[in-house]
């Protein structure tokens, strides 16, 4: 059984910094990536949670200024992204820290996508046959910090948003926009309601099953998927019903 209480760094497919308390290194991570004034993007429901204030305090201790943008609904809209871009530009920010569950990270990734270029948001629609011809320097440097289990969306650029004119959900992305790194701090998952732990854990389990079941066989991905299935199926029930045990282990 892996020891999940130790710190570990690896790259797959982007740099990942894992371990209890790694959030306390966020200011250092910003400095290492030449981010001096990040916009912290999260959703309204997370705005007043302790970890948001902690991110700002840790950044300040590393002489990194930051501002929180939290005008994000559970299903982020194109209008909210436009307001987020305006906050990014007016605040003269040089990076984005996307923190939260799906909505916070989707919004942060979308603001990173359009924050320092003039391309229309929907030009990045995943269903378009061609993406805008932009270099990686055309996108805002991005750090992702997930606060729940789930899809692994912190490692890639896709963001699901609501098109308010057509009242449909659309996916935006660009192949050259990827997070600089993801910070996986399991302490952020402690204290979640049991039902949310169950939902997001099942989400992660289903993604692992899907990854193993796809017809395009890949031995590396199959190995990762099978290990994820083994770990989640052996831990999820205990995490939901005895979450305090995990909290004691991480104390």
Predicted regions and their residues:
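ATP/NTP phosphate-donor binding region
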Residues: 1-95
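Short, acidic Gly/Pro/Ser/Thr-rich loop/turn segments
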Residues: 24, 47-48, 149-152, 189-191, ...
């Amino acid at each position: 059984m892996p020891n999940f209480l130790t710190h570990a760094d690896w790259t797959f497919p982007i740099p990942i910094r894992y371990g209890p308390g790694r959030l306390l290194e966020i200011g250092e991570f910003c400095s290492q990536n030449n981010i001096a004034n990040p916009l912290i993007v999260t959703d309204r429901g997370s705005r007043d949670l302790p970890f948001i204030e902690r991110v700002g305090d840790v950044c300040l201790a590393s002489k990194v200024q930051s501002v929180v943008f939290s005008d994000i609904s559970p299903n982020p809209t194109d209008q909210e992204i436009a307001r987020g871009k305006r906050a990014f530009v007016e605040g003269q920010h040089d990076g984005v820290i996307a923190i939260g569950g799906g909505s916070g990270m989707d919004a942060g990734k979308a603001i990173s996508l359009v924050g320092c270029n003039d391309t229309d948001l929907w030009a990045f629609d995943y269903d378009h046959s061609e993406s805008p011809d932009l270099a990686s320097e055309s996108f805002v440097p991005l750090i992702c910090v997930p606060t729940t289990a789930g899809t692994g969306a912190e490692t890639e650029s896709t963001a699901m948003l609501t098109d308010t004119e057509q009242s449909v959900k659309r996916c935006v992305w660009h192949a050259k926009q990827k997070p600089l790194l993801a910070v996986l701090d399991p302490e952020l998952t402690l204290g979640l309601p049991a039902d949310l732990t169950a939902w997001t854990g099942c989400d992660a389990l289903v993604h692992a099953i899907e990854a193993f079941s796809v017809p395009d066989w890949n031995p590396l991905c199959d190995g990762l998927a099978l290990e994820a299935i083994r770990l989640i199926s052996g831990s999820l029930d205990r995490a939901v019903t005895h979450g305090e045990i995990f909290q004691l282990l991480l104390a």
